Design a protein with these regions (language model features):
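Ligand-binding loop in jelly-roll beta-barrel domains
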Residues: 73, 77-115
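Conserved hydrophobic/aromatic beta-strand scaffold that supports enzyme active sites
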Residues: 30-34, 51, 85-87, 106, ...
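Surface-exposed beta-loop interaction hotspot
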Residues: 101-162
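Cytosolic regulatory regions built on CNB/CRP/Popeye-like sensor folds
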Residues: 1, 34, 64-65, 102-104
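Conserved short histidine dyad/triad with adjacent acidic residue
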Residues: 18, 29-46, 68, 158-181
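Double-stranded beta-helix
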Residues: 79, 137-142, 146-153, 161-188
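Hydrophobic, proline/glycine-rich low-complexity stretches
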Residues: 1-42, 49-60
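Glycine- and acidic-residue-biased ligand/ion/polar-headgroup-sensing regions
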Residues: 46-69, 88, 162-163, 175-188
Length: 188
């Protein structure tokens, strides 16, 4: 990625569209959508799986032609309530219609067969405290290895109190040397 400072896409519901190719990565993709009430978006996974995180607002989700109902758990990310989301396996069409102003994050990575579409309920996501002092932060584990709803995606939301650090102690994920280091591609 030549330019590390990305700016929102103008005049588009899709504000960011980061692909493995555009970032010169192997796996991770990320899209961010800002929808107004009544707007809709449609997409289809091919070789990738996705987790759609409802950052702010509420919307109806349809997966493979089946209405899965309304998702959303907050009107502002700063409410510090857990988000809700939806797991989309590979080769699956999906659409979302905004019932309110809606911000969506679409996290993606290569997938494998054998996983099913599933709702990620906000009341099943627990708040975890990590670190101490100025290194304290709060984590919502949306999809992690202890809740294997996805093949290769790990998705969290982090809240860092004002004046605190989010990534301490210093660490890296640029090689596989388990259990010392694991290779991960991360977006923040």
């Amino acid at each position: 990625m030549k330019n590390l400072l990305l700016k929102p896409i103008k005049n588009s519901k899709k504000k960011f569209d980061i692909t493995p190719q555009s970032a010169h990565w192997k796996y991770v993709g990320f899209k961010l959508f800002h929808l107004e009430k009544g707007d809709d978006i449609k997409d289809k996974t091919i070789f990738e799986e996705s987790i759609i995180v409802f950052i702010e607002g509420y919307g109806e989700i349809e997966v493979s032609g089946k209405n899965m109902g309304e998702l959303g758990s907050r009107t502002s990310v700063f409410e510090k309530k857990p988000p809700s989301g939806f797991y989309i396996p590979l080769q699956t069409s999906w659409s979302i219609k905004a019932n309110t102003k809606l911000i969506l994050a679409v996290c993606s990575a290569p997938g494998k067969e054998g996983f099913s579409p599933s709702i990620i309920k906000s009341d099943e996501i627990k708040l975890i405290e990590r670190g101490k002092g100025s290194n304290k932060r709060f984590i919502f584990n949306i999809a992690m290895e202890d809740n294997p709803i996805a093949n290769s995606l790990l998705v969290t939301e982090v809240f860092t109190p004002p004046g605190n650090w989010s990534s301490y102690p210093p660490h890296r994920h640029d090689e596989n040397d388990f259990p010392n280091i694991t290779y991960l591609e991360e977006t923040y």
